[in-house]
Amino acid sequence: MNKYEVVKLIGVGGEAKALLVKRINSDKLYVMKQRMFFLLEEANEGLCEAMSLAKIQSPYIVRFEEVFLDNNSNMFSLCIVMEYCEGGDLMDNLFKRISDSFLKNSGLNNNQNNNNNNNNNLNSIVNNNILNNNKNSKQSTTNTNSSGSNSSIASNTTNNNNNNNNINNNNNLKAYENFFSKYVPSETLKGVNQLVEPNCNKDNNKPIEITTTDSPRIIINDNESTNNLNSQSDQILQFSISSESSSFSNNDLINSPNSNDSNLHQSSSNSSICGDYSSPPNLEKISSPGTSTPYQKGSNGNTVNIRCSDIVVEAVSPIKTESIGCQIRSTTSPCTSGPTSPQMIPLNIVEQPPQSTSTSKTDSSPTGADVKKTKMTWWKTYKSSKKDKKQTICSNACESFSNSTFFNDPSSHSQPQHQQLHSSPQQLPQSPRLKPNIESSLNINGNNNNNNCSTLLKLPRKLFYTWIYQICLGVQSIHKNHLVHLDLKSENIFLSESQKIKIGDFGLAKKYENSMSGVAGTYYYLSPEILLNKNYSRPADIFSLGCIFYEMYTLNLLPLTKRSFGQELIEGKFDRKAFKQEFDDSDEPIADLILDMLNLDQNLRPTIDLILQNKLFERISDINSSFNNLLNIVNNTGSSITNSKSNSSNNLNNSNSNNDIINNNNNNNSSNNINNNNIVNLNNSYNNKQDKCEQRNKSLNQNGFLSTSSMGSISSSFNEHEFVRRQLEKNDLDAAADVLCEAFKEEPRFQFVSGATSDNLETKNKSIELGQTIRKSFFTMCVRLMFDNKFMLWGCFDYENKLIAVACWSTPGKSGAPPMTQLIVKILSMLPKFGFRTMKRIGKIMSNIDKAMKNHDSKLDVYYLPYIGVSKEYRDLGVGQYLLKPVIEWAEHQRKTVKAVVFSQKQINFFSKLGLSVGHTEKITNLKGINSIYVMSKNSQY
């Protein structure tokens, strides 16, 4: 601790606390997590766990700087120093994007530059709208006199323009309010769909009263609110997203005490016309020093503070849904949802006609012809909104942002991990989430583009896929180190200053050995098996990852919407159809992927490797591999230049020591020598790479099937992201047959079939040509037959999208080969082409393999690998192991056995590196050149 200086306390809870520190004599910031222990043995155990976490090396994991024990009086403090992420956490970022997007698109973010313009703050919107809606001849005369030389015609024109601006601003605020109403439990929305026209007081000096149906009165003081909006120095947008108790009722709002009016009136001076914020059950209230408390004097409860960049706006409460000049029509959405899925609340906002007689006639509600026209032009409107999505959603996608104060409310930060689950799921109310109807015209910018919230409130597409890809890479590095995070959530995913993803908070991480049990994590992200207190493992992280992806796409933050997918799955209330309706049609693949990750059966969830090989990430992985290749070239070039310069400088120093006087000619010669040395070294480095490639190709083993040389061990230079693995499609089958045909050229079983092991010299000479024909015909037939019978055909592609490796898997329940009837028919069709002798050899091979498999284990509930092959030029890069790992890990999660049949010791060595062992050896006497058939298997570890 003597090396660090505490800057501020970030969070406290239970036995642990988090500090923002900086190293003495340095301005670099770090995050230090301290945990107190009474016993030295427990502290040492925690130290060992922290050291194992520090071994994880990944750019997408929060870096551990230092881990040490500090003796503090009678207690021991375990201190973990980690890098500080300037970008904050992902939940802060998502919520700030929500607020900034609305403010940006509504034009409210220019409020600071237009403080004198009454149309740009909430108070003047209310006042001007009421004045314009209640115009009469006396008010018109007053306005004309106050304007000096302006004529009555100019006054009426100004009033009309102001009225239009007010309606647009009201629509902006209404869109903002309607979005955040998704964070309000459904009970509080009952009876609030119809708004009542406000009554205007003739005396402008009195507070203006705005009354709504089924909600308490709100009193806005004309003078105080304007001053407060301009006098706030912290620039905080305040609003509320739920009520006080966990059981919500609209009657509680109606039957509130009379003193509530005075409280509301008092809170208006603090810019808080809000209800209460109900923190999720897993969050704890922590008072952070140096930050303003979220509890405002005179408010009815917790007020959520959102820091905005330019203004202070007192948002209309979503619970009370007051708005002037707007009316919400409660219509039935064509996309109805399930029992616990989000309630669809279409928001058709239309302008209300003013309630006064005036010479200027305003528009009324849309007529039947207008409605018909709107329906006819819906698709064009939808297409235009999709086309302009990049302009409407957050344009500053990758821009650095300051930490939002929304989660300065410590209730939104995590508790100590051992206390994170203390509320019963049954006590949590179901909450609606708003999916705006495409036909609802929110008219954010005051034009007729009919933009909707789903268009406005969405992460930029490229940023979304980049972030989830980086998160997956971070989780992959965790699982590769045999760890399970167990507390993946958006609050534990951080952003660096350059907006790169960093996964942190490993307080609940466990070493993966066998399956684990016990409840751990954050309720809204917990998988069903954890909620049911069953055994769990890495699939629990996959489930949490699916929850995070859902949050990032829909911006429905689960701790605020009070939604638990795990609980819905357990109760059988999860509606897949309604879930997919929250995604655009063009993004159906990501919806399907998330649904797979949220599968109730943990054995059916994809592994992190399978997720990374999804087609969604192909382009990103190609870009990353190209970038990594470029970095390697730059690094190699830079190192060679550095070495050449150091060598030349050493030569110059030696010459200086021998000669005291150096003339200009010698200097010129030495500089020329330096340049020449650089060129020579660069050429040498390039030539060395070519020599290595040639040596590699020359040293390739001719055995093209399952040998250590043909498959290759993963070398230190192997980069997984240079290749893409995926399941093959129908148009890939011909290329797959070619790869297998070339790879099995020297494989023992095909050597026997082609006659290469025969004692007859003439047969040996014909074996090369015959073997090529046999392999080509056999694999063309076999690959198509396996594809038709739903075998798993995996392929690995290089950066040019060329197929370089193929693996054929039979899934549990299959016999390991295509149906015998179909196979016999196909083989008999080859009889006229190859003759009876060749077909007899094929039959011998197949019967011996089948015998070996049955003698080992006759169960069909296994993953069996009949064929795998890699192109010759890629056999020493570890492509074979890379291609097989996803299915092997998938089998581990499903607790299934993996089997393969091999014919040589080299092939045994290859599979041993993947965890397979020889389970049975079948001695062979009737196959020349083959002494034994080995059945290798890997049983599930849990």
Curated annotation (Swiss-Prot):
Annotated GO MF terms: acyltransferase activity, transferring groups other than amino-acyl groups; ATP binding; protein serine kinase activity; protein serine/threonine kinase activity
Residues of the Protein kinase domain: 4-617
Broad class of enzyme this protein falls into: transferase
Keyword Coiled coil among record annotations: yes
Compositional bias (Low complexity): 258-272, 353-367, 410-432
Residues forming the catalytic site: 487
PROSITE patterns recorded: PROTEIN_KINASE_DOM, PROTEIN_KINASE_ST
Coiled coil: 675-703
Catalysed reactions, as listed in the record: L-seryl-[protein] + ATP = O-phospho-L-seryl-[protein] + ADP + H(+); L-threonyl-[protein] + ATP = O-phospho-L-threonyl-[protein] + ADP + H(+)
Composition bias type Polar residues, residue spans: 288-303
Induction notes from the record: Down-regulated by phagocytic stimuli.
InterPro entries per the UniProt record, alphabetical: Acyl_CoA_acyltransferase (IPR016181), GNAT_dom (IPR000182), Kinase-like_dom_sf (IPR011009), NEK_Ser/Thr_kinase (IPR050660), Prot_kinase_dom (IPR000719), Ser/Thr_kinase_AS (IPR008271)
Keyword vocabulary terms for this entry: ATP-binding, Coiled coil, Kinase, Nucleotide-binding, Serine/threonine-protein kinase, Transferase
SMART domains the record matches: S_TKc
EC number: 2.7.11.1
Residues that bind ATP: 10-18, 33
Region Disordered, annotated ranges: 109-170, 247-303, 352-371, 408-445, 642-686
Source organism superkingdom: Eukaryota
Record family assignment: Belongs to the protein kinase superfamily. Ser/Thr protein kinase family.
Name of the protein this chain belongs to: Probable serine/threonine-protein kinase DDB_G0279719
Species, as recorded: Dictyostelium discoideum
